[in-house]
């Protein structure tokens, strides 16, 4: 749908209604997400199981990548220490926009069993903005698959032409 406006001296400007284009692009983006794994402890083992033939994230369009520059989202799985938090932030900063984060397991979400340790970060969201939390200790591959489906819903609902605000930043504003 197109509309015409007269901006004054410059002539006519054509405005386009892009909601159908947004839907088409978001459907393509949600169906081909590349992920970066950041497995740190026992949740990392479940993360590997999710990529295996029984759970197979690839059937949902999620493809693992070794480089953060090729990844759309990062899965942080396991206990995040302050020393590893610097590396997680560095990898997150190297990812292209729009970028998303899934926090997998109790240790990533809030520190989990090791939260009283002096070197344990009390949640990934203290270091990088998180979009989807997957609970469990460790979460089953089915739970991570549900987290991926939730992330796909988030990607489908966003307008692709605007700069996105991660969930953690949006809550703080």
Curated annotation (Swiss-Prot):
User: Could you state a single Gene Ontology molecular function term?
Assistant: quinone binding
Q: Does the keyword Cell membrane apply?
A: yes
Q: What is this protein called?
A: NADH-quinone oxidoreductase subunit B 2
Q: Gene Ontology terms, cellular component aspect?
A: plasma membrane; respiratory chain complex I
Query: Which reaction does this enzyme catalyse, per its entry?
Result: a quinone + NADH + 5 H(+)(in) = a quinol + NAD(+) + 4 H(+)(out)
Q: A GO term (biological process) for this protein?
A: electron transport coupled proton transport
Task: Quote the InterPro entries the UniProt record gives.
Answer: NADH_UbQ_OxRdtase-like_20kDa, NADH_UQ_OxRdtase_20Kd_su
Tell me which PANTHER family the record gives.
Answer: NADH DEHYDROGENASE, NADH DEHYDROGENASE [UBIQUINONE] IRON-SULFUR PROTEIN 7, MITOCHONDRIAL
| Enzyme Commission identifier(s) | 7.1.1.-
NCBIfam families linked: nuoB_fam, PRK06411.1, PRK14818.1
Note describing how the cofactor binds: Binds 1 [4Fe-4S] cluster.
Cofactor(s) in the UniProt record: [4Fe-4S] cluster
Sites binding [4Fe-4S] cluster sit at: 42-43, 107, 137
Keyword Ubl conjugation assigned = no
How does the annotation summarize its subunit structure?
A: NDH-1 is composed of 14 different subunits. Subunits NuoB, C, D, E, F, and G constitute the peripheral sector of the complex.
Described by its record, this protein's role is as follows:
NDH-1 shuttles electrons from NADH, via FMN and iron-sulfur (Fe-S) centers, to quinones in the respiratory chain. Couples the redox reaction to proton translocation (for every two electrons transferred, four hydrogen ions are translocated across the cytoplasmic membrane), and thus conserves the redox energy in a proton gradient.
The record's subcellular locations are: Cell inner membrane
User: Which family does the similarity line name?
Assistant: Belongs to the complex I 20 kDa subunit family.
Q: Which organism is it from?
A: Anaeromyxobacter dehalogenans (strain 2CP-C)
How does the protein associate with the membrane?
Answer: Peripheral membrane protein
**Which UniProt keywords are present, listed alphabetically?**
4Fe-4S, Cell inner membrane, Cell membrane, Iron, Iron-sulfur, Membrane, Metal-binding, NAD, Quinone, Translocase, Transport, Ubiquinone
């Amino acid at each position: 749908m197109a509309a015409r406006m007269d901006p004054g001296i410059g002539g006519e400007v054509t405005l386009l209604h892009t909601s159908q284009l947004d839907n088409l692009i978001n459907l393509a983006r949600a169906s081909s997400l590349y992920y970066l794994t950041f497995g740190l402890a026992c949740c990392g083992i479940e993360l590997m199981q999710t990529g295996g033939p029984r759970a197979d994230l690839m059937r949902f369009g999620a493809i693992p990548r070794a480089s953060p520059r090729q990844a759309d989202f990062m899965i942080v799985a396991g206990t995040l220490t302050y020393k590893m938090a610097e590396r997680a932030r560095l990898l997150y900063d190297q990812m292209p926009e729009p970028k998303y984060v899934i926090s997998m397991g109790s240790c990533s979400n809030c520190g989990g069993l090791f939260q009283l340790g002096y070197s344990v970060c009390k949640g990934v969201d203290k270091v990088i903005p998180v979009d989807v939390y997957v609970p469990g200790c460790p979460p089953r591959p089915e739970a991570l698959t549900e987290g991926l489906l939730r992330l796909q819903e988030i990607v489908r609902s966003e307008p692709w032409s605007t700069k996105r605000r991660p969930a953690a930043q949006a809550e703080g504003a």
